[in-house]
Amino acid sequence: MLKLIVETKTLMQSLGFARSIIEKRNVIPEYANIKLSAQDGNLELSSTNMDLYLSQKIAVQVLNEGEITVATQTLSDIVRKFPDSELTLTEIEITQLEIKGQNCKFNLFTLPVSSFPAMDSIKPEVSFKISCADFAKIIESTKFSISLDETRYNLNGIYLHIKDKEFFAASTDGYRLSISWITLEEKIKNFGVILPQKSAEEILKIVKDPKNIHEDIEILLSSNKIKFICNENTILLSKLIDGTFPDYSAFIPKSSVSKLVINRKIFADSIERIAIITVEKFRAVKLSLSRKILEISAVGEARGTAKEIITASQDKESFYEYNHDESLVIGFNPQYLEDVLKAIKSDIVELYFSDISASAPVLIKFPRNPKDIFVIMPVKV
């Protein structure tokens, strides 16, 4: 019967990842539980929500090998409140788990291990390794433009694909498009899959963890599943979205007639300030561009108006340059601009305008990040 000693901090961190996987309104008891398996000096923690399966291994002192399942939320809440640096977990008569510190003890009811689902096997058609830092970069640069419209299920995730040694991530909600990529060290078979939003969020948390960010992640792909192996001790298996992602290359503007170059932070801060006056029903900020100034303004129904002016400058900290003699007035959903400007921490951002009519998609680039591009549709103002 299971008995082990574990560092409280280490257990708490793993339970945090497990809790994130499990659906909060889970009506199936087995899927609200976590399986604990103690063997060979390790504790394996398994959690699932049917679409995702997470397995984590942490080093512990195993006094007796064994495995049990227990309510994830309850176990996590208890462990979080323990002041002790170490805890002893002991299986009691198959139906209970004892969690014991120096002066405090809990007994939790358990469910049979036989009722907990096993991780599905996967027959990979493609497998490769990249750094966790690179993978985090392409997911963070694209996750915010995933469509939330469930009727457009093929847009409810990030399109991961390889083409000619380039590993791409792309997402779109029909109003904006985000693309980020890295170059692989070796040539891999071309492929394309759609990673669900929830899966993207969970693997991003894992690769950004301090113990993983400087390691590699192995990615294994089949026709309907994707498996991530991070730092050898963490495995995330996810179902894929069964659908076809649109050919997004057709939506990327191929030419421009004018360009705005501006300090990213100055621009982002101004957009965020002016957007305060806008209302949820119709969120729009107006950009009035000329060679000398950029005027950012907005009108909020039953709220008022707001306006800010940025003057032309060649100073790095306040850089602003618009390269067309004819002025341009164009509107954007401020949230769409803010998402892009927050995703890439670069000094300078460039906006490319295809025409002066202010109705064509706008291409956004960052000179220091050439492998990230964004497209936003303007709105009427």
Swiss-Prot record:
GO terms for biological process: DNA strand elongation involved in DNA replication. GO terms for molecular function: 3'-5' exonuclease activity; DNA binding; DNA-directed DNA polymerase activity. One of its GO terms (cellular component) is DNA polymerase III complex. It holds the Pfam family DNA_pol3_beta. It is found in: Cytoplasm. InterPro entries: DNA_clamp_sf (IPR046938), DNA_polIII_beta (IPR001001), DNA_polIII_beta_C (IPR022635), DNA_polIII_beta_cen (IPR022637), DNA_polIII_beta_N (IPR022634). CDD domains: beta_clamp (cd00140). The keyword DNA-binding applies. SUPFAM superfamilies: DNA clamp. Coiled coil: none annotated. Keywords: Cytoplasm, DNA replication, DNA-binding, DNA-directed DNA polymerase, Nucleotidyltransferase, Transferase. Belongs to the beta sliding clamp family. PANTHER family: BETA SLIDING CLAMP, DNA POLYMERASE III SUBUNIT BETA. Forms a ring-shaped head-to-tail homodimer around DNA which binds and tethers DNA polymerases and other proteins to the DNA. The DNA replisome complex has a single clamp-loading complex (3 tau and 1 each of delta, delta', psi and chi subunits) which binds 3 Pol III cores (1 core on the leading strand and 2 on the lagging strand) each with a beta sliding clamp dimer. Additional proteins in the replisome are other copies of gamma, psi and chi, Ssb, DNA helicase and RNA primase. Confers DNA tethering and processivity to DNA polymerases and other proteins. Acts as a clamp, forming a ring around DNA (a reaction catalyzed by the clamp-loading complex) which diffuses in an ATP-independent manner freely and bidirectionally along dsDNA. Initially characterized for its ability to contact the catalytic subunit of DNA polymerase III (Pol III), a complex, multichain enzyme responsible for most of the replicative synthesis in bacteria; Pol III exhibits 3'-5' exonuclease proofreading activity. This is Beta sliding clamp.
